[in-house]
């Protein structure tokens, strides 16, 4: 099992819009994630988002970020997230500090 932790920041005042976007997750994006067996949870704390995801492999996870639907979603999210000079969301990988149980093997 592949696990992934990332953090990124919301633009000021965008938390409600971010939540709504995910409450109304595009069906074609959800279908891609389900097909790749990606499970995900995102937590919020003081303007920072923390993503934790699992997938059968890194390749499965990365496939969810490919194709026109993923590109459109990234462009949509760029309006809510802090971005670099090219307009891409600034995503920082999290180093795993501890794992227990099923996560210890991944």
Residue positions per predicted region:
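Short, flexible turn/loop "capping" segments at secondary-structure junctions
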Residues: 1-2, 44
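Short glycine-/aliphatic-rich beta-strand segments at the starts of folded cytosolic domains
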Residues: 2-17
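Hydrophobic pocket/interface hotspot
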Residues: 6, 18, 22, 51
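Short amphipathic alpha-helical segments
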Residues: 14-37
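Short acidic, gly/pro-rich beta-turn/loop elements at beta-sheet edges
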Residues: 16-18, 52, 61-63
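Short, glycine- and small/hydrophobic-rich beta-strand elements in well-ordered beta-sheets
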Residues: 30-58
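An amphipathic, aromatic/His-enriched active-site/gating alpha helix that lines ligand/cofactor pockets
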Residues: 32-36, 56-92
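Short, low-order "capping/linker" segments at domain edges
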Residues: 87-106
């Amino acid at each position: 099992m592949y696990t992934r932790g990332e953090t990124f920041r919301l633009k000021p005042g965008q938390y409600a819009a971010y939540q709504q976007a995910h409450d109304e997750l595009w069906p074609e994006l959800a279908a891609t994630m389900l097909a790749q067996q990606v499970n995900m949870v995102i937590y919020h704390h003081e303007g920072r988002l923390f993503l934790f995801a699992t997938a059968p492999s890194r390749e499965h996870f990365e496939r969810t970020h490919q194709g026109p639907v993923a590109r459109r979603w990234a462009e949509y999210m760029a309006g809510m997230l802090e971005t670099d000079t090219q307009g891409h969301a600034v995503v920082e990988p999290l180093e795993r500090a501890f794992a227990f149980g099923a996560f210890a093997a991944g």
